[in-house]
């Protein structure tokens, strides 16, 4: 079933096509900047005037007359007014605005979803090194990545969430050495803390309490489950490889617990080490060499990345024969593409900005059919945490930073998700712990959730065992007050808001929308009593608030936030 707006857009596209072949693709409505000007605005006449060499006002009048004669506009539109150089301001009939209530109640949790498009998108996020607990920055990335995944699902994409484990770098050696030293009884600050060439200065080791936890578990010959495999320690403090594998497995298990507390489930964990074990890294380098995209200089192998827009050529293989970190990244993204993911979105910190050009250059130089601009990137800044008016910088558990688990324990999963999504990813953000637990309108997640719970309370006041299905076909004509009209217009904007948020990888837009919707509901609730004696009026108002609760629920679900029925 087409929505009112879709019907009107289809009619507009048909009339534009008659004006100029191909112009139907320009069919679009905007929201008027001034509410008094109408419900929808159309600027097509001004866009077409120049290429058609016509007066925009005259073209607007022509389009106005044509639209007024269409069945869709006659059914749903009260008036079309022309303004300025050719703006078309459209006023909807009350029935057109009321129709969204029926759409929401009929579609339920699927309201806002688009049909399946038969394409796959891979969203890679968190991808933390298995060297310590997840910090608040990882939490921001987890919230952003999961919400973007939900947004793509609403647009008909088949979504694959992936976590890339960097388990093959220098940091893993640092983790292993740190654990080995603790297992031998050393600790930071000891006079005997090693400082020779094999064991760098203590500042280069991980000092958090979690390292001692790993060492204790290793000495106890514990077994830990990480993803799809279990690993058992042998307790031998001289068995470096056993310590390495156990420490990585232990921290992967700990990170999994953090993600579970965040209600986040990945479809796949992809190990960097597997790219080497399966020969993908060597194969990628060989392909780049065979394509003539590399050269030898100063004992190193270089990629001609400046040929693809990078600011300088990049070293691929160092003098010691090891690869630089972007080489496995190129191999990994070739694997993503060859697994059938036509679209890939990477969520990363802004400190990774410098890798974008070189990875894309490597993918183009490999010449395997990957389109330019692949993959997409969403970069986010770190998070500053404030508690009791003071910045919190250190966690005893981690030793040097506030962990995601700390933040969840201090507040809640819902608060952490909503707060970390409430600003553009590349905007600096201060997480106020005290605000996140406040039960007042200054707390945005409380404000939105309270609107949902308040509606559920009203519905229980109607019937304790209420079923909104009974409201789908009620007469909605009593919904004519200004607050009701504003609320219905906002409900109708939900699908297009999702589409725009997905296109822009902008989950913060969902938080803005939900706050506006909650405000519109509270305004309506204060203006019109819902459980009135007049049965027809009561039924119509119940249908409207039930539809509002459904959209609040749907939007919160996109963010991974619950919609409580009681608070």
From Swiss-Prot:
It catalyses: tRNA(Arg) + L-arginine + ATP = L-arginyl-tRNA(Arg) + AMP + diphosphate. One of its GO terms (molecular function) is ATP binding. GO terms for biological process: arginyl-tRNA aminoacylation. The keyword Aminoacyl-tRNA synthetase applies. The keyword Metal-binding does not apply. A motif ('HIGH' region) lies at residues 128-138. It comes from the Bacteria. SMART domains: Arg_tRNA_synt_N (SM01016), DALR_1 (SM00836). One of its GO terms (cellular component) is cytoplasm. It is found in: Cytoplasm. Its main location: cytoplasm. Its EC number is 6.1.1.19. Keywords: Aminoacyl-tRNA synthetase, ATP-binding, Cytoplasm, Ligase, Nucleotide-binding, Protein biosynthesis. Belongs to the class-I aminoacyl-tRNA synthetase family. Monomer. This is Arginine--tRNA ligase. It comes from Acidovorax ebreus (strain TPSY).
């Amino acid at each position: 079933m087409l929505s009112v707006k879709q019907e009107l857009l289809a009619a507009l596209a048909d009339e534009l096509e008659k004006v100029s072949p191909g112009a139907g693709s320009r069919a679009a409505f905007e929201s008027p900047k001034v509410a008094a000007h109408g419900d929808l605005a159309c600027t097509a006449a001004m866009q077409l005037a120049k290429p058609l060499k016509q007066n925009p006002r005259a073209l607007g009048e022509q389009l106005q007359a044509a639209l007024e004669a269409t069945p869709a506009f006659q059914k749903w539109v009260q008036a079309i007014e022309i303004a300025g150089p050719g703006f078309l301001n459209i006023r909807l009939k009350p029935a057109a605005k009321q129709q969204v209530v029926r759409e929401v109640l009929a579609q339920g949790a699927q309201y806002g979803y688009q049909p399946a498009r038969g394409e796959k998108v891979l969203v890679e996020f968190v991808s933390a090194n298995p060297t310590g607990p997840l910090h608040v920055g990882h939490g921001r990335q987890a919230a952003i990545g999961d919400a973007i995944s939900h947004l793509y699902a609403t647009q008909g994409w088949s979504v694959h969430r992936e976590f890339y484990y960097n388990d093959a770098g220098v940091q893993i050696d640092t983790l292993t050495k740190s654990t080995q030293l603790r297992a031998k009884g050393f600790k930071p600050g000891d006079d005997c803390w090693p400082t020779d060439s094999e064991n760098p200065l203590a500042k280069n080791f991980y000092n958090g309490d979690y390292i001692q936890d790993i060492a204790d578990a290793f000495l106890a010959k514990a077994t830990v489950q990480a993803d799809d495999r279990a690993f058992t320690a042998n307790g031998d403090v001289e068995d470096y490889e056993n310590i390495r594998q156990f420490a990585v497995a232990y921290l992967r298990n700990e990170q999994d617990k953090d993600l579970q507390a965040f209600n986040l489930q990945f479809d796949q964990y992809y190990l960097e080490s597997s790219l080497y074990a399966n020969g993908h890294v060597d194969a990628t380098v060989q392909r780049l060499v065979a394509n003539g995209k590399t050269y030898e200089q100063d004992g190193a192998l270089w990629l001609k990345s400046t040929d693809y827009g990078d600011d300088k050529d990049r070293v691929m293989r160092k003098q010691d024969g090891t690869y630089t970190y972007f080489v496995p990244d190129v191999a990994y993204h070739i694997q993503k593409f060859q697994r059938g993911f036509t679209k890939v979105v990477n969520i990363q910190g802004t400190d990774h900005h410098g890798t974008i050009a070189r990875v894309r250059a490597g993918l183009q130089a490999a010449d395997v059919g990957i389109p330019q601009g692949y993959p997409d990137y969403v970069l986010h800044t770190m998070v500053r945490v404030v508690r009791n008016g003071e910045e919190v910088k250190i966690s005893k558990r981690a030793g040097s930073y506030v962990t995601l688990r700390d933040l969840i324990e201090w507040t809640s999963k819902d608060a952490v998700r909503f707060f970390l999504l409430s600003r553009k990813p590349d905007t600096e953000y201060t997480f106020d712990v005290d605000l996140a637990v406040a039960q007042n309108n200054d707390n945005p997640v409380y404000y939105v959730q309270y609107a949902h719970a308040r509606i559920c309370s009203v519905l229980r006041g109607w019937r304790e065992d209420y079923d909104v299905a009974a409201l789908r076909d009620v007469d909605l004509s009593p919904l004519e007050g200004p607050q009701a009209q504003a609320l219905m217009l906002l409900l109708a904007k939900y699908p297009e808001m999702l589409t725009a948020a997905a296109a822009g990888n902008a989950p913060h837009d969902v938080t803005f929308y939900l706050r506006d919707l909650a405000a519109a509901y509270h305004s309506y609730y204060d203006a019109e009593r819902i459980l009135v004696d007049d049965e027809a009026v009561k039924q119509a108002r119940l249908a409207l608030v039930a539809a509002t609760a459904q959209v609040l629920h749907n939007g919160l679900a996109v963010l991974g936030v619950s919609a409580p029925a009681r608070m």
